[in-house]
Design a protein with these regions (language model features):
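N-terminal accessory targeting/assembly segments
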Residues: 1-108, 113-117
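Phosphate-interacting basic helix/loop segments used at nucleotide- and nucleic-acid interfaces
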Residues: 10-17, 91, 150-155, 242, ...
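Active-site phosphate-binding and catalytic loops of NTP-dependent enzymes
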Residues: 16-17, 58-62, 97-101, 116-121, ...
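A generic structural signal for well-ordered coil/turn residues at beta-strand boundaries
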Residues: 25, 46, 105, 125-127, ...
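P-loop NTPase nucleotide-binding/switch module
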Residues: 90, 104, 117-165, 179-183, ...
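P-loop NTPase catalytic core
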Residues: 157-158, 164-472, 489-498
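Long, intrinsically disordered, low-complexity tracts enriched in Ser/Thr with interspersed Pro
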Residues: 466-484
Length: 498
């Protein structure tokens, strides 16, 4: 060594040139019970991604940290832990729950980890963001004061949606939920569409993309698919990723339509995770974490800071056995800004979209439309409900014309109202045209149709699509007398629901 060499300079030089790798921390797999893996000897935060390596490095499984107790980590694997042996090595792969986001995702179909499902290369996104997002101060959110044209006249005119609103689409199975979702996806005037297909059948992913979206719709969309056969933690991760992508484009000033199908499957995934790590079951077996997760997800949608962009969210909610008192339906109603309920009775009579006005509501409609439109929509809903309440009496001819003038009007307008609520799934209806049509219907009555007031000779078909049929038989006079007598015997005036 040169005696003139400064020792401290030499140390500094060596410390910059020699890079010592950080020591890698390992743990050991000690127990596997059902969906849960338990590891000791490793400290990792919740949400961290770990890699479990079996003997001879031949079997590797990724898992997410979902809980811990004392010195034990609880992990949930992304895939079946087949081939993983006792004492397998557990190491941290990604300590933070982060995801790569960017405009490169547009037009792509990806999984819960951002990997492509469409056969193309992995999107090269440069923005690394926390998966659970960053909460917005409620005082900094902009108001919901702009109409969002969804192209479905029943919703545009009677359940008007605003940019940044959160809506629930509540339906049982087989009542046209997917068809209405497709209409909303294609017809809504939004800059970006983010679709999370969570926990549904795998075959529906390709069908939804090809039939409901199409090439033109996919070009401005991002689809995140997590079918029912994958791990519950991946289904939850896909849900978080869907919200994060929507938040990214919202913060870029875009008006985003986000559709999550379905919120019920998200709750099921959280139930699987919660019960597996020992949470106590509550209503319908759901652990408390479910009732915390859903409002947190829903609050991520809405108008951005100071009105900069918006996320209009549509969450489908499965009403099992058409039970609208299900706990998930209840919490969705409490957390959302309105709901659109689909009725099996309407679907069975080929009435599409099968929107049940009696249970559906938009809580911000009165802030979006003028007073006249709001009053017209209210009258339409009132007449629709009044007819349904008295439908049995009308069907059997027990209602006496003139007993209730408003019900007479409901019967007269019923065919036109039924026709107005139906719409071809390939034909959009502009917002202004929808409003104009409903005003004409209520103010002027049905066009090209003889006004009919309820009388005992009118018999409504069981399907609401049909017009009332007037019977003009030679015995109509005697029929009139006998029916009127029957109506009197029934004391219709007292039985009528007003």
């Amino acid at each position: 060594m040169n005696p003139n060499t400064n020792f401290s300079d030499l140390v500094d030089k060596l410390s910059t040139e020699i890079k010592i790798k950080e020591p890698c921390k390992f743990g050991t797999l000690v127990r596997v019970v059902g969906l849960t893996l338990e590891a000791r000897g490793l400290e990792a935060p919740l949400g961290a991604i770990c890699e479990i390596v079996g003997d001879k490095n031949t079997n590797k499984v990724e898992a997410e940290v979902v809980g811990f107790q004392d010195q034990v980590l609880f992990l949930m694997p992304f895939t079946e832990p087949t081939g993983i042996n006792p004492g397998a090595t557990v190491k941290i792969k990604n300590p933070n729950a982060l995801a790569k986001i960017g405009p490169e995702l547009l037009g792509r179909v990806i999984d819960a980890n951002g990997e492509p499902l469409d056969g193309y290369l992995t999107p090269k996104c440069s923005n690394l963001l926390p998966l659970r997002g960053i909460a917005i101060n409620p005082m900094e959110r902009g108001p919901i004061n702009k109409v969002l044209d969804v192209g479905v006249k029943a919703i545009n005119s009677l359940l008007t949606i605003g940019q940044g609103q959160r809506i629930g689409l509540v339906a049982g199975s087989g009542v046209g939920k997917s068809s209405l979702m497709g209409m909303l996806t294609r017809f809504t005037k939004a800059d970006i569409v983010v679709i999370g297909l969570i926990g549904e059948r795998g075959r529906e992913v390709q069908a939804f993309i090809s039939e409901s979206l199409g090439p033109q719709g996919l070009a401005k969309s991002v689809v995140i698919a997590a079918p029912a056969n994958i791990s519950p933690v991946l289904r939850l991760r896909a849900t978080q990723l869907s919200h994060l992508i929507a938040e990214y484009f919202r913060d870029e000033g875009k008006n985003v339509l986000m559709m999550i199908d379905s919120l019920t499957r998200v709750a099921h995934a959280q139930r699987e995770v919660g019960l597996a790590i020992g949470e106590p079951p509550t209503a319908k077996g759901y652990p408390p974490s479910v009732f915390s997760l859903l409002p947190n997800l829903i609050e991520r949608a809405g108008v951005g800071k100071f009105g900069n962009g918006s996320i209009t969210a549509v969450y489908t909610v499965l009403a099992e056995n058409d039970d609208t008192s299900d706990p998930i339906v209840d919490i969705a109603r409490a957390s959302l800004d309105g709901q659109v309920i689909l009725a099996r009775k309407l679907a069975d009579s080929a009435h599409y979209p099968s929107i049940d006005l009696n249970g559906s509501i938009s809580r911000v409609m009165q802030n979006l439309v003028d007073e006249e439109t709001h009053l017209i929509a209210g009258k339409f809903r009132r007449l629709w409900s009044l007819f349904q309440q008295n439908e049995d009496l009308i069907q059997v001819g027990a209602y006496k014309a003139g007993t209730n003038p408003e019900l007479d009007e409901a019967i007269r307008l019923r065919p036109a109202m039924v026709s107005f609520l139906q719409q071809d799934m390939n034909t959009p209806e502009d917002f202004s045209i929808s409003i104009s049509k409903i005003k004409d219907l209520i103010n002027k009555g049905p066009s090209n149709q003889t006004s009919q007031v309820a009388n005992p000779n009118i018999k409504l078909n069981q399907t609401e699509n049909s017009l009332p049929q007037v019977t003009n038989s030679p015995d109509s006079k005697s029929n009139n007398n006998s029916s009127a007598k029957a109506a009197s015997n029934f004391n219709t005036g007292n039985r009528l629901i007003q």
